[in-house]
Amino acid sequence: MKGLAELKNKVVNAPHVNMFKVATWTTMGVFATYLLIYIFAGEEMLKYYPLLIVFAFGAPLVSLMTSKASVKRAYNIRMIDNGGARTEKEQLVVDTVTLLSEKLNLQKLPEIGVYPSNDINAFATGASKNSAMVAVSQGLLNNMNETEIIGVLAHEMSHVVNGDMLTSSILEGFVSAFGLIISYIILNNRRNNRSGGAAASMASFYMIKNSINFFGRIIASAYSRRREFGADRLAAQITDPSYMKSALLRLQEISEGRVDLQDGDREFAAFKITNNFSMGGFANLFSTHPSLEKRIAAIERMEK
């Protein structure tokens, strides 16, 4: 039977954390914001550029920096590292994250926790790969075997080593900056056309603001789906494709109601995302994860 013992003997070519990717995202976001100001708002607004950067990118980055403390309170997470594991499966989580951290050459072990929920969930958060936290739900421990749990944890550790949380925050900041620029343009036009156009300008303001939020969600969701495929692929590489496939198949069985949950609760969310797997057509634009069918198919291609 596959499991942690087999993984210990596996030689892993640890991927280099692509700091160039993070730096590129940051540079592109800052430069694109400057360019948008110059094109759409003119040179006059360039004097507000530093303030705009602080407001647009500061909020998501501060949120990321404080994410560990926030989610610990919100989800009542009990830390199980440093001797806090109470069951065999909790110890499995600690041992797996520890082993993967060593194989991925992380300088600091992520904090590890369990939270009381019937959802089949796990997530990673933190500002960087060396200040991360990985948490799993009690529902996941109750309803997955050793191989499946390892697959899920490898997926979350892939998010950590890829710096996905930071790049998502940068994208959020860019969308926010674009919204602030457009808002300035509309409000400025409203001030310059006070006679008879105030109501129309305000209506335009809300229409464009909502449109920006709408398309921003589509962009963020598309990036998230791409990110999930990447995490699945890396998880399969550092463990074995069968680990990731078994976890995804188990999630598929649970989502389709083909197995009885030990918790007696069919509320389902894969890897800390609500159930979007029944979505189709237009609704797929807002799905943060690819369908389980597509993810399983991608892993099966790796097995060939």
Locations of regions flagged by a protein language model:
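Hydrophobic or amphipathic, alpha-helical segments that drive membrane association/targeting
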Residues: M1-N121, F178-A222, Q252-E256, K304
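An active-site-proximal "capping" alpha-helix that borders the catalytic cofactor pocket
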Residues: K68, T96-S101, S224-P241
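Residue-level signature of catalytic and energy-coupling elements of molecular machines
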Residues: K68, V97, A122, V136, ...
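Active-site-proximal gating segments in proteases and membrane effectors
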Residues: L106-S131, S195-G197, F205-Y206, A235-K304
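Membrane-proximal, non-transmembrane interface segments of integral membrane proteins
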Residues: D119, A135, G151-V152, N162
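Alpha-helical transmembrane cores and adjacent cytosolic helix/loop segments
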Residues: N142-N143
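Active-site His/Glu-centered metal-binding helix of metallohydrolases
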Residues: L153, M157-V161, G230, L234
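Catalytic Zn2+-binding segment of zinc metalloproteases
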Residues: M157-S176
